[in-house]
Each structure stands twice: as structure tokens, then as C-alpha cells.
UniProtKB/Swiss-Prot annotation:
Keyword Lipoprotein among record annotations: yes
GO cellular component: extracellular region; host cell plasma membrane; membrane
UniProt-listed Pfam families: HemolysinCabind, RTX, RTX_C
Subcellular location: Secreted; Host cell membrane
Name the record gives this protein: Leukotoxin
InterPro entries membership: Hemolysin-typ_Ca-bd_CS, Hemolysn_Ca-bd, RTX_C, RTX_pore_form, RTX_toxin/Mannuronan_C5-epim, RTX_toxin_determinant-A, Serralysin-like_metalloprot_C
GO biological process: killing of cells of another organism
Membrane topology of this protein: Multi-pass membrane protein
Each Hemolysin-type calcium-binding repeat, start to end: 715-732, 733-750, 751-768, 769-786, 789-806
Regions that span the bilayer: 230-250, 297-317, 359-379, 381-401
Main location group: secreted
Domains (record comment): The transmembrane domains are believed to be involved in pore formation in target cells.
Gene: lktA
């Protein structure tokens, strides 16, 4: 018995493979037939050639074929002339069962007769008398063919609706007709397939006494316990409910909640009704066949049917319509600004969503039926042939639908394509996608107008130039991919606006911004004395883009980006005092990235700035920068961004204001331009579009070099910078970090900023301000001025020659403590911060201990000055320290401050000191409140603190 069932199982497997191969071939033929039928009449014709002779001994008989065709409503046409001869040139009607004419699908009577003459088929049909209940063999064959072709023909109705540019509701109705057709034809097919499946596998005897097995087409009325008003109508009701829900989803005027509800209704109707109907029908077959119908078996069947249904598919469809709804809302604003692309995207989502809803409903029903039959077959070899054939025919129909679905999607996409092309034609050839960026920019401008109009006041500039880079937009990218117009899309577009006295001006007459050539010209300043050039968003590198769409697979395309790059931005300024913040100008290009999106190979875009007249300020960015300051007092700032420590060596410069600045930017994150890929899907078609955009990418360390000309002051970074001055007058500000500053020759202005700095004035009359931190200060030769404030920390000063001064700019002289510590003079303020003047007493002590010692150095500071101009000389300090045994008494300091003669002397002397410090203030640090350059509140650099510089006299 075991071997018998093994042989049966093997036979079933071989039969299944044969059936599968045949069904696949049939599916291809049917699809081809359907495509050819688009322009022909949709009817089935039984074609009988003139003078055809048939063998009544072997065949079914021409009379039976004609009778069966008439019963089934198939037109019978006998060849009288050559009016349908063209059928022979289509699918070879004389050689095949199926053929095409301009009037419809042709069934070849000779080929059908040959089919019926085959031994296996003839025997199979002949032994099915009890099951077919009097139907002839011919009618069985014709009924099955008619059922399958009916589905194909209904599918052609849907295709025809698409070809006529029907709206979404029409498409849904066409889908409904297809659903109804499938319900009817699946039922008819099962009747036919039951008979064939039973006999082909030589198991007919097992089923000959199964009452009602072939009655599904008659709504199961022959099954025990079920009539056409119950179970059969449930099947129809479930499928029709699903199709009705598809209509709701197609209604663009329906609310979002209703559409979401429809999506769940679609799933629930199919899951509920189809599971119940299919499971009950299959159980009834098993009962009729005398097979088990226990709880576990019923559960297996029901669960298998349920698993064949995917509610997530319907949820995805509902999401599509929700997305379309949100796009429609989003599109309203941009439509008013002249761009309707978002609405086109919504139209695409609605159209494809409708198609998805219809096809998914049909496929769900087919999957449920096939799954249920297969589950029933799991416990019985008897039902296996039926299961295989049912699965096969539903698979053929599903395949046809899926192939049709892609064509439907492409049709919707083609409509979008045509609308874009038509718009460009009607608008003088303007790029549709560029128009989209224009609309995005205008919306952004409207949203930020209040902020922008306030910039003149906030930035303290008569004119503000705002440059905005509109970067890649995913909706625009989707539209370009769907419409197959990726070659026309741009990575973005740059815009410029001007504001004066809180008014928005047309900037095209005031500013030249040419991203293709790399030109930014703001030299036409008009009456404006001050202007601020603000890069609101990262500006992409200059150059032009070209794209090329290539096919990489059956449904895969990529639009490659080719960039004709310009190697530099050329910036031109005029007579106004201008501020440029270049930190938002992208200079680094990520040429090669690793798997983690880290930049491992870069390219650089240089900035060349010609500033002209005026007192200008430039904040340098991440790459090589060349600056010609021109006339005026010009500052170059490295205090914004995190672009490496400076090394400046101007010792060999032959022209004042000329510097070479070397920077090493350590590994970290910095603004880079990189190329990415946007993906848009149209059913199976995948469109990839390359585009460039800015991003903070992790990079390896790199070197960069800046060339400065006619620059009066350099402000350093937050790193440990090194400054070596020229033989001319230099002005350096270390900023944050532990900086080393050497003024070299010239009358230098040196500021340490934050951090424990080392500053050496070198030769010349230098102004030295250590700033916050414990600084080591050396004046060198010349008449030097040192400044200390409360909160600056503990400074150490070494001085040798000249008439030097130390100003405690926010402390009263009488509040300070003077005392001798070893060879040094230590001055302590009220915050207990100490300024140590190294070796103040060393020469005097050497003179006391060494006979005939002659002093060779003067390590003292000649005047120490309080915040109100009161002062004490080095001579007075020596006398009072001597008098107080190493410490000046507070009362003595008070006398010094209160002494009229000393005050009078202080007033007279203050004039000269005031002039000196006033001169020094022209070279003040960016830490000076008078030099803190305004930025929009949202863009303020916390490293630029405001420290009031109080004059010492």
C-alpha cells in the first residue's frame, strides 16, 4: 500500500510539473493574445475551415463542437471565402488551437478535434460522464478555454480604459468589471478542471460518486448542506465588497479616514468572506469524498486560506492614498507660486493606488482559493490534482495581471511626462524642475521675510546681501524619476536677495551671482557705507551639471551626473566696509567615500577675494583662500568653524600686510560636497538619479594654505596657533587655545585671547594683551604697554628695555597689593589674581651684593596705572617696598592716589598715554566689544565674547 501511494505521489509530482509547464506556456500565449487583441473585436469564434473532414470514429465530432459552442454562446463561423484567412498569420490558427483575427479570438475546430482525438484526453473526458452530467466532451473543453479567455478579455477592458486616459474612477470601475468576470470564470474553470484533474491522474474512480464536485459554477447548489443562497453568494459578496472598497480608494474626494477605512474594509471583507467560503467549500468536498473533516483539518484549511491573504498589502495601498492626500495639501502653496509638480506626484499616487487596489483585491481572492484547495489536498492524494490545477490557473491569471499592472503604472507615469513636456513647451522651454526650485525658494523667502528684514539692524549694516542655496528636493527627484526626465533635473539652485533699511530690494541689479562661472560680485554698493554678505545655507561649488540616463537592467535605470567644475569662487567687493562669512561656502568636495560614508579622498575649491576699499572683515572657511584687502583696515578671522590651527611665518615678508597662513585640519567632521543617489520607483521600474549636496562628513586630516595681502589684523582659531610677525607692524589675536605669538620687529598689537598664551613683542613699541588665562608676556625692546583685567588669570611679565607701562584697566590702584617675592614684584587684585613682573629687584640686589656691579638691564615697568588714570612709578614702588619691608602698605598707596601733585602729573601724562592707547585701539582684538562683528542671533559664534577694553588714561 505504501509503494502504491509512493507511485501515486511520484505520478502527481510529474503531472504537476507537466501542468505547470503547460500553464506557463499558456500564460505567455494568452498575454500575447491579449496584447494583439487591443485593436480587435472582443469575441470568441469557433472557426471551421471550408471542406474540413473529420474522423467521427476518433474525434468528438463536428456536430458536437458546434452544439457545444452554441450552448456556450460562442459564435460559429464556417469558412465561405478568405474573410478570416489572416488568422493564419497571427498565431498560426491552422497549426494552433488559438488564433487572432480583426474580429476576435479564433478557436480552430481542426486543432480542437485533434486534441479530443488524443488518447489520454479523450479517455479522461469520456470517463467523466457522471460528473459532467450530460455535458459533451467538446463542451467541457470549450467551457474551460472560454473561462480563461474571459479573464483575459476583461483585462483588455481595463487596458482600453487606460489607453483612453480615463480618470481614476473609470479605472476602478474597469477593475470592478474584471473582478466580476474573474468570479464567474474561476467558478467555470473549477468545474472543468475538476473533471480534467480527476481523470488525468487516473483517480476518477475515487471521485465518480462525489456528488456536486463539478457544481461550483452553479454556485455549489449540488453540495450537501449548501445552496446557492448561502455559501456561493458569500464568495461573490466578499469579492464584490473588496472591489467596492477599491472604488472608495479611487475617489479623490473621499476623506483620508474614509480611504483608510476602505483599506481595512478591503482586507476584512476578503479575509472574512473568502476564508469562510473557500474553507467551507473545501470541507464539503472532503465530507462528500468520505475524507476527514475534523477540527485540526478544518483549522489547517482556514489558517492556510488566511495566510494567503495579506492585509498589509491593503494597508500599503491606503498609505499611497494618504501620501497623495498630503501631497495635494502641500501642493496648494507651490501651485500659487507657479509650480504644480507636487500635485502631479499626488496624481501619480492616486492613479497607481487605484491600480494597486484593484489588482491586489483580485490577487487576494485568487491566492485564498488556491491556498485553501492546497490545504485540503495536504491530507489527501485525491484532491491533489485539483489543487495543482487550481493553483496553476490562478497563477496564470495573476501573472497576466502583474504584467498588466506594470503597463498600467507606466501609462500613469507617461501622462505625468506629457504634462511636464507640454508645460515646458508653453513656457518658452523653461526647465520644469528649475521652476520647482524657484517655487521652493519663494516659499522660504516668504517664511523668513520678517527675520530677513530685521538683518540690517541686527548685523549693523546698511545693506545685507543674503545668498540662499536651494538644495536637492526629494519630491522634485521623485517626479523626475517617475516621468523619465532625470536628465533635466538640477541638484539645486542659488539665489540672492538684498535688504536696505528694512526693505527688500531686487538684487539682480546690485549683485552678480553666477554659480556656473563662480562669480560673486558685490562691488556695486551705491550709497551704502557698510554691507554684510550672509550665506544663509551652504553654497555648493561652482560649475555646470550634465546628466545622462542609462539602462542597467531590465527595469533599472541610472541618471549619471557629470560636473564641469570651476576651480574657484571669485569674490569682488567695492568701496563699502563689508563683512563676508565664508564658512558656509562649500570648498571641500568628497571625491571618494568609504562604506561608512567617511571622506577618504577630496578635492578643493579655492576662494579668491578682492576686497577693495573700506574696513572689511572676512571669516575664512575650510579651504584655500586668497585675500587682497585693498585699502582700509581689513581683518581676516579664523575664529568660526573648526578648520585647524594656524601657523603664520611672516619673518621674510617684504610687504606690510602680507602673510602666508598654513593650516592643518585634523580628522573630524567638516562641510563637504558629496554625490548621492535618489531612487524613485514606478512599479518594477527603478530610477536612480545622482545629485550633489552638502553634508557634514567625517574626513581625514588635510593641509591648506591661505595667501593674505594688504591685511591689517589676523584673528586665530580655538586651536594652538603660532604667529611669527614681520618686520612691519603686525596685529595678531590668538583667540582660544594655547597660542604662541611673536611680534618680531615693528610696533605690534598682540592679543592672546583665551588660553595660557606665550606672547613676545620683540623689537618695537608693542601693545600686549594676554587676555584670559595664565599668560607669559615678554615686551622686548621698545616702549611697551601691557594690559590686565579682572578675570584674566595669573600673568607673568618679563621686560628689559624702554619706557614700559602696565594698565589695570578695571581696578583702582589703591585696591591692588604690591609685594616683593624673591627677585620679583607681585601685584594682586581683589580677585586674588596675580601679575608677576619677573626680576624687578634683581639688578638692585646684584648691586648690593656684588662690588662695583654695573646694571646692564632694566627689568622694571616704568609706570603702573589704575582704571582712573592714577599711577605709580617704578621709583615709587621701590621706595615704598623698601619702606614697608617688602610690601607697600595700603595707606601708602592711598596717599599716592590722593596726592595732588601725583594726580596733576597723571593728568598731564595721560594725554600722551591716551594717544598711545587710542592708536593701539585701532588694532583692537575681536574680543573687544567694539570689534565683535554682529551675526544673526541664530548664527552667533560663542567663541567671540565681548570684553570691554577700558583705556588706561
Amino acid at each position: 500500500m505504501g509503494n502504491k501511494f509512493t507511485n501515486i505521489s511520484t505520478n502527481l509530482r510529474n503531472s504537476w510539473l507537466t501542468a505547470k509547464s503547460g500553464l506557463n506556456n499558456a500564460g505567455q500565449s494568452l498575454a500575447k493574445a491579449g496584447q494583439s487583441l487591443k485593436t480587435g473585436a472582443k469575441k470568441i469564434i469557433l472557426y471551421i475551415p471550408k471542406d474540413y473532414q473529420y474522423d467521427t470514429e476518433k474525434g468528438n465530432g463536428l456536430q458536437d463542437l458546434v452544439k457545444a459552442a452554441q450552448e456556450l454562446g460562442i459564435e460559429v463561423q464556417k469558412e465561405e471565402g478568405n474573410d478570416i484567412a489572416k488568422a493564419q498569420t497571427s498565431l498560426g490558427t491552422i497549426q494552433n488551437v488559438l488564433g487572432l483575427t480583426e474580429r476576435g479570438i479564433v478557436l480552430s475546430a481542426p486543432q480542437l478535434d485533434k486534441l479530443l482525438q488524443k488518447t489520454k484526453v479523450g479517455q479522461a473526458i469520456g470517463s467523466a460522464e457522471n460528473l459532467t452530467k450530460g455535458f459533451s466532451n467538446a463542451k467541457t473543453v470549450l467551457s474551460g478555454i472560454q473561462s480563461i479567455l474571459g479573464s483575459v478579455l476583461a483585462g483588455m477592458d481595463l487596458d482600453e480604459a487606460l489607453q483612453k486616459n480615463s480618470n481614476e474612477l473609470t479605472l476602478a470601475k474597469a477593475g470592478l468589471e474584471l473582478t466580476n468576470s474573474l468570479i464567474e470564470n474561476i467558478a467555470n474553470s473549477v468545474k472543468t478542471l475538476d473533471a480534467f484533474g480527476d481523470q488525468i491522474n487516473q483517480l476518477g474512480s475515487k471521485l465518480q460518486n462525489v456528488k456536486g464536485l463539478s457544481s461550483l459554477g452553479d454556485k455549489l447548489k449540488g453540495l450537501s448542506g449548501f445552496d446557492k443562497t448561502s455559501l456561493g453568494l458569500d464568495v461573490v459578496s466578499g469579492l464584490l465588497s473588496g472591489a467596492t472598497a477599491a472604488l472608495v480608494l479611487a475617489d479623490k474626494n473621499a476623506s483620508t479616514s474614509r480611504k483608510v477605512g476602505a483599506g481595512f474594509e478591503l482586507a476584512n471583507q476578503v479575509v472574512g468572506n473568502i476564508t469562510k467560503a473557500v474553507s467551507s467549500y473545501i470541507l464539503a468536498q472532503r465530507v462528500a469524498a468520505g475524507l476527514s473533516s475534523t477540527g485540526p483539518v478544518a483549522a489547517l484549511i482556514a489558517s492556510t486560506v488566511s495566510l494567503a491573504i495579506s492585509p498589509l498589502a491593503f494597508a500599503g495601498i491606503a498609505d499611497k492614498f494618504n501620501h497623495a492626500k498630503s501631497l495635494e495639501s502641500y501642493a496648494e502653496r507651490f501651485k500659487k507660486l507657479g509650480y504644480d509638480g507636487d500635485n502631479l506626484l499626488a496624481e501619480y499616487q492616486r492613479g497607481t493606488g487605484t491600480i494597486d487596489a484593484s489588482v491586489t483585491a483580485i490577487n487576494t481572492a485568487l491566492a485564498a482559493i488556491a491556498g485553501g484547495v492546497s490545504a485540503a489536498a495536504a491530507g489527501s492524494v485525491i484532491a491533489s490534482p485539483i489543487a495543482l490545477l487550481v493553483s496553476g490557473i490562478t497563477g496564470v491569471i495573476s501573472t497576466i495581471l502583474q504584467y498588466s499592472k506594470q503597463a498600467m503604472f507606466e501609462h500613469v507615469a507617461n501622462k505625468i511626462h506629457n504634462k511636464i513636456v507640454e508645460w515646458e513647451k508653453n513656457n518658452g522651454g523653461k526647465n520644469y524642475f528649475e521652476n520647482g526650485y524657484d517655487a521652493r525658494y519663494l516659499a522660504n523667502l516668504q517664511d523668513n521675510m520678517k527675520f530677513l528684514l530685521n538683518l540690517n539692524k541686527e548685523l549693523q549694516a546698511e545693506r545685507v546681501i543674503a545668498i540662499t542655496q536651494q538644495q536637492w528636493d526629494s519630491n522634485i527627484g521623485d517626479l523626475a524619476g517617475i516621468s523619465r526626465l532625470g536628465e533635466k533635473v538640477l541638484s539645486g539652485k542659488a539665489y540672492v536677495d538684498a535688504f536696505e533699511e528694512g526693505q527688500h530690494l531686487k538684487a539682480d541689479k546690485l549683485v552678480q551671482l553666477d554659480s556656473a562661472k563662480g562669480i560673486i560680485d558685490v562691488s556695486n554698493t551705491g550709497e551704502a557705507k557698510t554691507q554684510h554678505i550672509l550665506f544663509r545655507t551652504p553654497l555648493l561649488t561652482p560649475g555646470t551639471e550634465k546628466r545622462e540616463r542609462v539602462q542597467t537592467g531590465k527595469y533599472e535605470y541610472i541618471t549619471k551626473l557629470h560636473i564641469n567644475r570651476v576651480d574657484s569662487w571669485q569674490i569682488k567687493d567695492g568701496a563699502a566696509s563689508s563683512t563676508f562669512d565664508l564658512t558656509n561656502v562649500v570648498q571641500r568636495i568628497g571625491v571618494e567615500l568609504d562604506h561608512a560614508e567617511n571622506v577618504i579622498k577630496t578635492k578643493e575649491t579655492k576662494i579668491v577675494a578682492t576686497l577693495g576699499d573700506g574696513d572689511d572683515n572676512v571669516f575664512v572657511g575650510s579651504g584655500t583662500t586668497e585675500i587682497d584687502g585693498g585699502e582700509g583696515y581689513d581683518r581676516v578671522h579664523y575664529s568660526r568653524g573648526n578648520y585647524g590651527a594656524l601657523t603664520i611665518d611672516a619673518t621674510k615678508e617684504t610687504e606690510q600686510g602680507s602673510y602666508t597662513v598654513n593650516r592643518f585640519v585634523e580628522s573630524g567632521k567638516a562641510l563637504h560636497e558629496v554625490t548621492s543617489t535618489h531612487t524613485a520607483l514606478v512599479g518594477n521600474r527603478e530610477e536612480k538619479i545622482e545629485y550633489r549636496h552638502s553634508n557634514n562628513q567625517h574626513h581625514a586630516g588635510y593641509y591648506t594654505k591661505d595667501t593674505l595681502k594688504a591685511v591689517e589684523e589676523i584673528i586665530g582659531t580655538s586651536h594652538n596657533d603660532i604667529f611669527k610677525g614681520s618686520k612691519f607692524n603686525d596685529a595678531f589675536n590668538g583667540g582660544d587655545g594655547v597660542d604662541t605669538i611673536d611680534g618680531n620687529d615693528g610696533n605690534d598689537r598682540l592679543f592672546g585671547g583665551k588660553g595660557d598664551d606665550i606672547i613676545d613683542g620683540g623689537n618695537g613699541d608693542d601693545f600686549i594683551d594676554g587676555g584670559k588665562g595664565n599668560d607669559l608676556l615678554h615686551g622686548g625692546k621698545g616702549d611697551d604697554i601691557f594690559v590686565h583685567r579682572q578675570g584674566d588669570g595669573n600673568d607673568s611679565i618679563t621686560e628689559s628695555e624702554g619706557n614700559d607701562k602696565l594698565s589695570f584697566s578695571d581696578s583702582n590702584l589703591k585696591d591692588l597689593t604690591f609685594e616683593k617675592v624673591n627677585h620679583h614684584l607681585v601685584i594682586t587684585n581683589t580677585k586674588q589674581e596675580k601679575v608677576t613682573i619677573q626680576n624687578w629687584f634683581r639688578e638692585a640686589e646684584f648691586a648690593k651684593t656684588i662690588q662695583n656691579y654695573v646694571a646692564t638691564r632694566d627689568d622694571k615697568i616704568e609706570e603702573i596705572i589704575g582704571q582712573n588714570g592714577e599711577r605709580i612709578t617704578s621709583k615709587q614702588v621701590d621706595e615704598l617696598i623698601e619702606k614697608g619691608n617688602g610690601k607697600i602698605a595700603q595707606s601708602e598707596l592711598t596717599k599716592v592716589v590722593d596726592n595732588y601733585q601725583l594726580l596733576k602729573y597723571s593728568r598731564d601724562a595721560s594725554n600722551s598715554l591716551d594717544k598711545l592707547i587710542s592708536s593701539a585701539s585701532a588694532f583692537t582684538s575681536s574680543n573687544d566689544s567694539r570689534n565683535v562683528l554682529a551675526s544673526p542671533t541664530s548664527m552667533l559664534d560663542p567663541s567671540l565674547s565681548s570684553i570691554q577694553f577700558a583705556r588706561a588714561a
